[in-house]
Amino acid sequence: MPVFYTPIPQNLRVGLANVSGSVFINNRTRDSADFKDHYLENEACAEVSSHLPLQMMLYFNMFFFPFWWISELLMLQLKFSYLPVYYQCLLVTGMVLISIFEVLRMYLGYAGNLKEKVPELAGFWLISFLFQLPILLFFITDPDIIILPLERAVHSLYLAFLLGELMASFLALRVMTRKLAQQFHMRQFGHVQGLHTAEALPMFGLPYGGRSVLPVQDI
């Protein structure tokens, strides 16, 4: 299993984890009867929560992006002289930003999904929604940038990848945050149950002094 070293600072990871917990967990008060089947609870906590459809889309997106980048670069070179100066600056800036964010996005997506790390996967979702999606929508919807047929085709396919990854990562985050919350509740419940058991043992067995309170008869 590869080891992923996250570039996210620790304070930002904590913030992303808190935001993910507040957004993706259904904060309902749980009754104590919810924990009556401990075997099923432990089995659910041990279940792998990595999202296979998300991993497949990340895999194919990683191979598709170089083709998208080369196509966009060639189309930009063809139409560059026909564009106003401000559109030239916008398109070049958009290409640079989308390339940088794509590398970071793929890394966070792989690390978050394979290693089941909520902050990394939340960072992947936020970058996809706040940066990649607006830039790509600008590339595909503004008619003044002279959208060529090849551009429209590769942008549409890239947009399909992006929307699918957004939905899949949202579902994966819900599963991971619920699993973490379930593990937390199980640890708390197990700790309280252990304390109650330890307090009850001296009443029926050996007290703290090591002497039995029950009468012992010679055989």
From Swiss-Prot:
Glycosylation sites: N18, N27
UniProt record, GO biological process: cilium assembly; non-motile cilium assembly; smoothened signaling pathway
Pfam families noted in UniProt: Transmemb_17
Transmembrane portions of the chain: 56-76, 83-103, 121-141, 153-173
Keyword Cell membrane among UniProt keywords: yes
Keywords: Cell membrane, Cell projection, Cilium, Cilium biogenesis/degradation, Glycoprotein, Membrane, Transmembrane, Transmembrane helix
Coiled coil stretches, renumbered: none
Topological type in the membrane: Multi-pass membrane protein
Subcellular location as annotated: Cell projection, Cilium membrane
Domain of life: Eukaryota
Keyword Iron appears in the UniProt entry: no
CC per GO annotation: ciliary membrane; ciliary transition zone; MKS complex
Function: Transmembrane component of the tectonic-like complex, a complex localized at the transition zone of primary cilia and acting as a barrier that prevents diffusion of transmembrane proteins between the cilia and plasma membranes. Required for ciliogenesis and sonic hedgehog/SHH signaling.
Subunit structure: Part of the tectonic-like complex (also named B9 complex).
Alphabetized PANTHER family for the sequence: GEO07735P1-RELATED-RELATED (PTHR13531), TRANSMEMBRANE PROTEIN 17B (PTHR13531:SF4)
Family, similarity comment: Belongs to the TMEM17 family.
Name of this chain's protein: Transmembrane protein 17A
Gene name, Swiss-Prot/TrEMBL: tmem17a
